[in-house]
């Protein structure tokens, strides 16, 4: 059995054992179902990056197998996180806990896997400041970890953009902070979120107050995309059109929507083309 096959088995096992505990809760059950599907979608997007980006084309099949495994398992602790929230109403960092969990398993105790899993959802500065990363003496290993992390982060964003823009009505419950509130108040973009976006920055979670804030923060992930293939793929899937429709549904002012889309298009043009 290959490493990737073992990873798929582990992912399915973690999903099934935690799903059994939360299955009586519609919200937690729905969230968990979305996350197992998401993991497979991220794996698919990640495979595209690994096949098409120049950096990975020169790497060995063994290295690519490890990279594919890290990407597939990026959310390995999500199912435990949802179960813990259901049982104890406690929050955990699924990236940090996922890395700890995998480091205890012989097959997956590899910095090429555990560090990308740990930091796939963090602000990138947190990764660079992690002693486990910056204390590595082998510069080639550090570069390999960084590129796998970049692939995992990009694939995660692409998959989230896809499911949110294509299945918005079904995803409102698990994505928006106030999914039942369709008033104009939820279409307001608060100042901290707006200013961060205008500066071309990833929006801090602590800034998010409204549904519109949430959508703008998700779209602002574009400022953290690393590979041109990721942008090419997203553009082929018409994610920007999907975001425009969602922002309109949330009753965001059209002038602000136009500004948002123009900023994103201008950034993509200058950064990747």
Model-derived segments and spans:
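Short coil/turn linker motifs that delimit alpha-helical repeat modules in TPR/alpha-solenoid proteins
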Residues: 35, 64, 109-110
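Long, charge-dense
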Residues: 105-107
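Short, structured loop/turn "capping" segments at alpha-beta junctions
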Residues: 110-113, 124-128, 161-162
């Amino acid at each position: 059995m290959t490493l990737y096959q073992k990873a798929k088995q582990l992912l399915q096992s973690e999903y099934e054992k935690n799903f059994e505990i939360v299955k009586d809760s519609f919200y937690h059950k729905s969230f968990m179902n979305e996350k197992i599907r998401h993991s497979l979608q991220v794996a698919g997007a990640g495979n595209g990056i690994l096949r098409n980006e120049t950096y990975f084309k020169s790497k060995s099949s063994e290295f690519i197998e490890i990279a594919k495994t890290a990407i597939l398992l990026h959310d390995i602790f999500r199912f435990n996180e949802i179960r813990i929230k259901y049982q104890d109403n406690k929050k955990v960092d699924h990236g940090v806990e996922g890395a700890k969990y995998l480091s205890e398993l012989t097959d997956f105790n590899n910095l090429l896997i555990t560090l990308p899993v740990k930091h796939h959802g963090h602000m990138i500065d947190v990764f660079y400041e992690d002693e486990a990363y910056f204390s590595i003496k082998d510069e080639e290993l550090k570069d390999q970890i960084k590129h796998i992390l970049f692939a995992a982060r990009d694939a995660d964003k692409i998959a989230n953009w896809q499911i949110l823009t294509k299945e918005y009505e079904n995803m409102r419950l698990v994505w928006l902070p106030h999914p039942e509130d369709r008033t104009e108040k939820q279409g307001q973009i608060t100042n901290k979120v707006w200013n961060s976006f205008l500066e071309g920055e990833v929006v801090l979670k602590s800034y998010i107050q409204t549904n519109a804030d949430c959508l703008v923060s998700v779209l602002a992930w574009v400022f953290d995309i690393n590979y041109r293939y990721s942008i090419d793929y997203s553009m082929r899937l018409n994610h920007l059109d999907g975001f425009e429709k969602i922002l309109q549904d949330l009753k965001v002012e059209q002038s602000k929507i136009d500004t948002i889309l123009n900023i994103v298009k201008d950034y993509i043009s200058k950064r990747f083309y």
